[in-house]
Amino acid sequence: MATEKRSNDLPKAKKPIGKGRTARATNKPVALPANNPTNGKTPAATAKPAKTTSNAKGQLRIRFQLRYRTSFGQTLFITGNHPQLGKGSADQALAMKYFNEESWYAEIDIDTASPAFTYNYLLKSADGSFTTDWGRDKTIDPTTITGKDLLVLDAWNYAGYFENAFYTEPFEQVLLHQRKAAKAISRKTTTHTFHVKAPLLQPHESLCLLGSDALLHDWDTTQPILMEPGAVNGHWSIAFNLNKAQFPIAYKYGIAETATGKFIRFEDGNNRVLYDAVAKDKQTIINDGFAVLPNTSWRGAGIAIPVFSIRTAKGFGVGEFADIPVLVDWAKHVGLKLVQILPVNDTTATHTWMDSYPYAAISAFALHPIYLNLEQVAGKQHKKAYDKLAAQQTALNALDAVDYEAVMKAKLDFVKKIFASEKTVLSSDDFKTYYAQNKHWLLPYAAFCYLRDEYGTCDFNQWPAYRHFNLADIEALAAETSAAYDAIAIHFFIQYHLHLQLQQAVAYAHANGIILKGDIPIGIYRYSVDAWQQPELYHMEYQAGAPPDDFAVKGQNWGFPTYNWAKMQEDGFAWWKQRFEQMRYYFDAFRIDHILGFFRIWSIPMHAVEGIMGHFVPALPVHINEFNSRGIYFDYHRYTQPFINDQVLWDVFGYDNETAKQYLDYNAFGQYSLKPEFATQRQVENHFAGVEQNDVNAKIKQGLFDLISNVLLFEAKDGKAQQFHFRFGMEGTLSFRYLDDGVKNQLKDLYVDYFFRRQDDFWQQQALQKLPALKRVTNMLICGEDLGLVPACVPDVMRDLGLLSLEIQRMPKDPKRTFFHPNDAPYLSVVTPSTHDMSTIRGWWEEDRSKTQEFYNKELGQWGEAPYYCEGWINKAIVIQHLYSPAMWSIFQLQDILGMSDALRRQDPNAERINVPANPKHYWRYRMHLSVEQLMQEKAFNDEFAGYVKASGR
C-alpha cells in the first residue's frame, strides 16, 4: 500500500503552500559524529539558539524557533490569541527573524501568570498571499513553565499531510481507538519535553523514543523509552532532564508493545537531531509534528442514500431521521463505517412535489419537516390520535416511491392538531437553550414560513409590509402577545423535535462506530430566508448553474443566486462559518457540493433559461485588442449577436422554418434578427407558457432558444464593447460553422487560452481566499465534489488543503482516458461507482453498448462480447474493485450494493435513479424497494458482502 512520502527534512515552500521534501526512508538509526552537526544526510532538528539575556522577575521569555526553508521573498510570522501575537489577526502577527537557511525565530516576554494561548505560523509569499500551518495543537501554558526561559522548537504542519485527516472529529471521536490519557507531565525536574503525533498505532502499541545519548538509551532497542499518550488521541509526549546530556543528540521515534515494552520498529526517514545548550532556568519543548510512520493504512467503506429513500417496516411513506439507526444496524453488520446522506434542509417553497429537490433549501439551517417521526412527537399523550393515522401510514409506506405532497400534508396536519397541547415544551429549559443557540436563523425562518403561507408565496418581494427583512419587526411579529405567535411558534416546535431526533440518530451511529456524512449545497434558493435576511450577500441578478457536458448538453441552470464573495469576506465569511457550525451539530464529515464554485461559478443572466447562456465568474475577459493582435477583424455584431440566415433557420427548424419567421425581423443581406419582444430566452419562455402545448410549439420554442444562444461571445459586464467572454462550446454553434476557416482557427486558439490557460492562477487565488479560512472554522472531515469541467489548479489546491476529492470510474478527470481505475485514486479521496446525479451501475451498463463493451474488456479484463444486462457478478466485480482502491473511503449507493445480487436487486434499474440533472423539474422520490429490516434478514448476502469489505482491509 502506498504511503505519503515524508521525512524529517525541512519543509520547503512551494507556491502557494509549503510542503515537506521527500527523502530516502530508512528504519536504521544513523550514527552521529560527536563534533559534526551538519554531517551528510543527518538534518538539523533545529539550529542552535542564540544567547538570551535574563528577563525580569515574574516574566517568561519565549523563543519560538521554526524549522522551515524559505524561498526568496518569503517571510514568516506567528499568529495567535495572545496580544503579542496579534490576537488572531494576520495583520498584527509577530514577524519572525531569519536565523539561517533552515530556521526562523522570534521572541516574546510575557507574564508567567498569563493564560494558555494557541498559535500558528504564517508564511507570507512574495505576492502578498498568506499560508497558515495547520492544526490547533500548538499551545503554551505559561503557568506550567518553571524556568524563566522557554525554547519552543516547532515543525511546520502542512495542511495536506495525510495524518491531519486523523485529527478531525470523526476519527478522534468515533473511528480510531481511544486511549486513556496519562497524567500531565511535571516539568519541575525535567528540561526537555518531546511532543509528537502518531494517530494510527494499534491498540496494543505505544510510541517510543531512542537516541544517541545514554539518557536516551544509546539506540538500545532492548530498552525503548515508552512515551505517554496525551489528552488528545494520537498525541504522545515524554520529558527528560538533559542537563548532563552531550549535545547534539540524534534520536528517533519508534513503536513498541505497550504491555511488554518489546521494540517493533523505528520511524522512517533520517535521524532527528537536537542542537541545544543547557542553561539555568531554561526549558525546551520540542514539537516534532508527525512521526514518520505508514499513514495510509486506515481505509473505510460506507453507504450513500438519501434519508427520504430509507424504507423501514414502520415508515410513513418516506425515510425519517428515526430510521437512520435501523440503517446503522445493517451498516455495522456488514462492516461499513459511514452513512452519507443528501441535504436535509427545509425546501418547502410551494407545498407541491416541486419542493422535493433537496438542493433548493429555503433555509441553509432549518431541517426538513418531512423527516419528522410523528410517533415520537405524539408520545403517550397523543398515541390515540397517532393510531388513527395507521391506515394512511400503511398505504403511504406501501408505495414504490415517495408521495411527497401526501406525506407532507399528513405530517403537518398532525403536528397542527397536537401543537396546542404540546407547545408547553417551548417553555422548557432545554428548548430555551436550543433557541438561544439558534435564534439567528430560527426566528427569521419561522417568521418566513408564516409569511410564506400568509401571502401564498415565498417570493418575499410580494410581501408588502415585510419585503425587506427587519429584525425588530420580526421580533414583534413573533412575540407571544402577537396574533401570529402560534402560527410562527409551531415552526420552533417542529425544528426542535427534528433537532432532537437527528441528534438521537447521530448518537446511536457513534455508539456503533459509524459516522454520518452530510452534504452542503453550493447554492441557496432564490426566495429563501437567507436571501431575505441578507440579500447583499448574493448576486440576485445571476443564476448559478453548470456549463454543458455529456449529461446536460444545454448546460444546467439551478436558478440559485450566486454568492457575492467580496461582501462575504468583509465579515470573515460569517454566514459560511455559521453554516459549518450548524452542520457540526449533526455531522462528522460533509461533502461540499460543487466545490468548483469556490474557484469560479457558472453564472447565467436572469434573462436566460438555459445554462449554455452563462459564463464563469470571476473570469479574466478577452480584450478586443487580443483579437486584433491575432489578425482577427473584430465584428461586434457578428460575434456577439445571434447569427441567423436562411440556412441557419433550415438547420434549426427544418420544414417549420417559415413558422419561426414570425418571431424574426428580416435585415439586409439575407440575415434576420429576433423581434425585440422575443430577444431573450425568458421572453420566449413566457410567451410559450401562454399558448397551446403541442409538439410544434415545443419545437419552435426550443429552436428560438437555440437561435438566441447562437453567438460566439458575451460582452463582459461593464465591458464597454471592449471586453468579452467566450460562449462555451463555441465550435458547436452554427454561427461558428459559417465563419472562414482562417478565422475559425484563430478563434479556437484564443478560446482554448481563455478557458484552459489564462484563468488558472486567478481561479487558484480566488479559492485560496475562501477555502483555507472556511476549513479552519470546523474540525469535520471535508470532502469536495470536484466533478465537471475541472480547472487545472483544483487538484493542487485540494491536495494542499487536505480536502478529499471524489473519484468516479466512469468520469475520469484525465480527458485522455475513457475510464478511471479505482486503483489509481489518491489516498485523500472518495471512490464511488456512481452518485445520486448518475445512473446506477446497472443503469449505466445499458446506456451505451460501445462504452460498456470497452469497459468489459479493458477494465474488467473479460474476453468476448459483454452481456447486454449487468449481471450480478459484473456488478460485484465493480464493487470489489472499489473496495480494494487505495482511497481512504469507498462509498456506494445502496442500489449498487444490492445490484450484486440477482435475487435482491430491483428488476428495473431505471427505477433506481435518484436524479436526472438535465431535468430541472425532476421529482426526487426514489425509495428502497425492500425494507432495511428485510435486508437484515438476508444472511447469505450480508455475510458475503461483509466478507468482501473485511478482506479488502476496510
Q: What do the predicted segments below correspond to?
A:
Residues 58, 72, 90, 188, ...:
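A short, polar/charged loop/turn motif at coil->beta-strand junctions and beta-hairpin connectors
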Residues 69-114, 124-145, 200-248, 256-278, ...:
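Aromatic-rich carbohydrate-binding modules that target alpha-glucans
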Residues 65, 79, 97, 122, ...:
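Residues in well-ordered beta-strands of folded domains
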Residues 60-66, 191-198:
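A short, amphipathic beta-strand motif
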Residues 11-21, 39, 48, 58-61, ...:
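Eukaryotic low-complexity, Ser/Thr/Pro- and acidic-rich intrinsically disordered regulatory regions
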Residues 21, 39-41, 51, 165-193, ...:
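Catalytic cores of glycan-processing enzymes that make or break glycosidic bonds
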Residues 3-56:
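Intrinsically disordered, polybasic Lys/Arg-rich low-complexity tracts
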